[in-house]
Amino acid sequence: MHNKSVAELSRELESGRISSVELTQQFLDRLKTEDGKYNSFITISDEQALAEARAADEMRAAGKATVWTGVPFAHKDIFCTSGIRTSCGSKMLDNFVPPYDATVTANFKAAGAVCLGKTNMDEFAMGSSNESSFYGAVTNPWGLSGGDKRVPGGSSGGSAAAVAARLVPAATGTDTGGSIRQPAALCGITGLKPTYGRVSRYGMIAFASSLDQGGPMARTAEDAALMLNVMAGHDPKDSTCIDREVPDYTATLNEPLKGLKIGLPKEYFSDQLAPAMEEQVRNAIREYEKLGATVKEVSLPNAKLAIAAYYVIAPAEASANLSRFDGVRYGYRCEDPKDLMDMYTRSRAEGFGNEVKRRILVGSYALSAGYFDAYYLKAQKVRRLIQQDFINAFKEVDVLMSPVSPTPAFRQGEKNTDPVSMYLEDVFTIAINLAGIPAMSVPAGFVDGLPVGLQIIGDYFSEARLLNAAHQFQQVTDWHQREPQ
């Protein structure tokens, strides 16, 4: 059963060939025997999962089942789950058990899905390799046969590794600068970052509030569409959540692609892209031409400024968001503080990891009195230029296509001493978050036995078009079906 997609598992449950309790137990057993190799989970919630599975079987017996009823999945450990620890990969929240559910969590519960647990992640979603987690690094299921341990990408590396290793059929992720798409690409799965405001952020622990967006991670575009059907929608608890009708994202998956206009941003096919990666991406684009699409080169002239702008805006917002973790109300508190200031200082110094502290420092500096205009305000002006570049491009084409990552998965520890080198891993994904548009990663080949992702970028609220393009590609290729050895 572990090799079946969400859609296939739903049909198995519908037919009565297996119950949700049996299916859930199979996945829990596999998780406990296999995850030692990957460290993709922080918390496995056996009792709650089996209770949800029993409720799902009752729901089905009463004729109230949805597509998701009884289907196992996992949440990235950034979504609050009532009664289940939500750590955000940090010592700071190692003992935090939320008293409420995030909206995304509540939506899956209402659909009858079964949450097996919480997946590992970079601490507070800050990272591109899933090596900054308080619970240890996650290992990419690909490349293990050669004796190498590769990173799965970050920050949603646990979700990506768990789906790639067939430990769960699907998992939620979040994307602030590439944190769904980059791990999806490096682990050979499908991942979608929706339009900013399409998915509620209520109960999703904040990193950078104007950039964060939750989204689906699964093996197929069809499964991603099924997930987005549950995740998307207006939520009055999140003031940035858009009040706009949610289509059935599975309804247009089979539309033909004849006449689709594809733009290739010349800035994303630059010297930063490894030649072998470019070859795989261009091969994938040729498949689209066979499906009836046309291709032209376009320009995003301000793309080169994206990383500089992002690493002012995101840390600035993070420094404000993370100021709430002070040892007073919840989270880690240092032992025997001398006074209030000592408690604040030591709780944060001991509770946060190095990468989080680095970004808080950068963000606080960018927001400080003498530098606000020079850094933060200027970065926001650059952000507007980047957004306008995409608006202009979509006047000419329907979608943009590019690589997701400049290289395949690198070895664990390879970039830990060079933060800038690590930040450059997101060079092709960050601008999309700054603009707030949707984009997804689709498996598109291999380099040296490691997966390559094709990035499909769309205009605002064009998730259905992206999923359609990805699904049609997956009908004529089998990259998404390959399994790590």
From Swiss-Prot:
Active-site residues, Swiss-Prot/TrEMBL: 76, 155, 179
Gene3D superfamilies per UniProt: Amidase signature (AS) domain (3.90.1300.10)
InterPro entries recorded: Amidase (IPR000120), Amidase_CS (IPR020556), Amidase_dom (IPR023631), AS_sf (IPR036928), GatA (IPR004412)
Enzyme class: ligase
GO biological process: translation
SUPFAM superfamilies named in the record: Amidase signature (AS) enzymes (SSF75304)
GO CC annotations, alphabetized: glutamyl-tRNA(Gln) amidotransferase complex
Catalytic activity of the protein: L-glutamyl-tRNA(Gln) + L-glutamine + ATP + H2O = L-glutaminyl-tRNA(Gln) + L-glutamate + ADP + phosphate + H(+)
Keywords, sorted A to Z: ATP-binding, Ligase, Nucleotide-binding, Protein biosynthesis
Protein EC: 6.3.5.7
Gene Ontology molecular function: ATP binding; glutaminyl-tRNA synthase (glutamine-hydrolyzing) activity
Subunit structure: Heterotrimer of A, B and C subunits.
NCBIfam families reported for this sequence: gatA
Family the entry assigns: Belongs to the amidase family. GatA subfamily.
Task of the protein: Allows the formation of correctly charged Gln-tRNA(Gln) through the transamidation of misacylated Glu-tRNA(Gln) in organisms which lack glutaminyl-tRNA synthetase. The reaction takes place in the presence of glutamine and ATP through an activated gamma-phospho-Glu-tRNA(Gln).
Record's protein name: Glutamyl-tRNA(Gln) amidotransferase subunit A
Upper classification of the organism: Bacteria, Pseudomonadati, Pseudomonadota, Gammaproteobacteria, Pseudomonadales
